[in-house]
Amino acid sequence: MSQRRIRRFAASMITAAALMFSLSATAKPDELVIATTFSPEATAHIISSWQQQPGAVRIRTINRTSAALERLLDTPALEDVDLVVTSSPMLLQHLQEHDRLAELPDLPEVSRRLVPLRLRDNAAAVAFSGYGILVNKRRMAENNLPVPASWDSLTDSRYQGLLLMSSPSRSDTYHLMVESLLQQRGWDEGWALLLNVSGNLATISSRSFGVADKIKAGLGGAAPVIDNYAWLLLGDPELAFNYLPDSATSPTFVAISRHSLNKDKARAFIRFLLSEQGQNVLADSSTGKYPVTPLPQGNPREPVRRRLLNSPHQMDENLVLKRQRMVQQLFDTAITFRLTESIDAWRALYTAEARVKRPLPHIRALLTAMPVSAQESADPAYYSRFDDNRKAEEEYIRWQQFFREQQRKAIAELEKVR
């Protein structure tokens, strides 16, 4: 077994033990247990509003990453969970494939249309979000930099050491953000842009909401984030948020555990979220989301809600679900695991371009090449390899060798620049 797989196995065992401990108390008939990928801050207002309803029961939440919840819900602990609240269709697909979700009939069309076709029998969409760039204006001013407003602007060499991201393997929010970029720009151009941006990263955060918190703390200057984490922080005058011009939508899904002993109360909670009152709660700035139903006429957020909902840049979620493991591992191999080397290579390139006062496209091409072609990326025969551990490991090794060789060639070419 490789060292990477040993570390991954050990981490999963530790996480599973911690999660089991968090559910050690037996589920109670007078409470709902919600497993969610959202932060406590993102769900606090929703839960508070629900508990003011007549006959409402107390809610207990388990806030974890999608990967951690996937491991948790594959154990007998699932029997203590009533609802799953997440923006991750990947998590819901995993639960559905393992027969972990109850059916949800008779949902309104405004909810159903935002749910991927294969999940429509088991999940409701109650709200949605968009993607943009969160900026610490103080950090920008200190460096005399413009506020970035698009993916392309994040490739500017002046942002070296100021950008933050998470990775698709650590955050399904970032997985969907990355997939949105790859599908809109095309496989090759999308990866070239991501690799270019990686040269400006300060670090890769382990949690998506951790990225927004780090920007607020001034540990970074700008980051692509989902809007609900940004809106929760925008009371700070030092922060600004702008939607990406080609932002896709990211629905908030709710599903009921097949093993829930409180299904009637769980359904009542979903009915509340889809009611007029519940939609108003979800539209409140303290949740940072947009409701699936229209906002009142004159509400300043309605034009943005409508633009995001009707964006032509929506994702092929079936493709996202099919090639999930491949994209996650490719991002980590290309960027996460070699971030230091990537930063050094791009810094050397920027220095060389500044010295000769012209771009060096042949070296940029070396630093942005990928070991997986656009054709392979959409080929089931290729991405299905990652369902087989042995075949997947062979690909990871090939990718590592590819990036090492590209780096070697780039350095050799930089040494020739005069």
Predicted regions mapped to residue ranges:
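A bilobed periplasmic-binding-protein/Venus flytrap-type ligand-binding module shared by bacterial periplasmic
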Residues: 134-139, 249-263, 281-282
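Beta->alpha turn/N-cap motifs
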Residues: 64-66, 85-90, 108, 207-208, ...
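Bacterial N-terminal signal peptides
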Residues: 12-22
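Extracytoplasmic ligand-binding site segments that recognize negatively charged/polar headgroups
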Residues: 44, 80, 87-205, 210-219
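C-terminal non-catalytic accessory extensions
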Residues: 342-418
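Mature extracytoplasmic/periplasmic domains
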Residues: 257, 262-265, 270-318
